[in-house]
């Protein structure tokens, strides 16, 4: 499976920017209560049905069933006009769907209304009113799509928080310091029982440019080694004694060059953004602290975007545009751990069986 993930990532060349979005969104409990509702049948077993329905309702309140987890991939290209872009986007869409089939992941393209609903739920996380929209109403009312998805207000007055309507939010970026990454990190982020949106903006680097870049770094490190050796000779001590950092960086750069040249690895520039929202400042701080604790556990640091909250918010919606210039270079295998599309959320409607509490 992991090899298929790597092949999936290697499909994207330098002309395609793609964004992976993982959205934890609180849903209305009334919706779930309607699904698990057991109607009386006017027979001798109605008492049992009532007791069973009461137990299900109690378990629903205990679990994390009110949290809906969604996963999206958004891709974008540069083109002179929409006529030129459309056939390219359709071809890329077809290739991505085929790659998902190889991974065993059911996927489908979203239509315009579904994309607008995602924006509506992102900008109005605590509003329980259902999203209602049709393109015919735009003609009758003179409104545009922004009027249907926007909250009552946006306020970006503070340094590291913002406000959408009655909701307070903050965008942070993940500083990846760990030498090795594990897929458990992303899984723990997505298990947080809070409103959270994780976005990964990924840009593939042209293979020749990546190899040339790493070669130049190796040359720079070798030049620094020679300078240190000259200093050692002039100072009268062993020229083989050089700073340990140079040996470490030199070895890592050579391994990276070998991976790019002979192990089917590509280089990707990754921006990892986290959007936390809550009703109060205290709840927001608690949610950010919980998220930062998971990052710290895996030797990464979650840092708030200072004076870039608006750009961070616009980069946290699935539109395929990244306004944050903070990027980390990762290889294919390091990036592949952020592709958890092989896990599937299960929710069975109709005549289903109760198994346990999640």
What are these regions (language model features)?
Residues 1-341:
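Extended, folded cores of ATP/NTP-driven motor/assembly subunits in large transport
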Residues 340-357:
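N-terminal pre-Walker A segment at the start of P-loop NTPase domains
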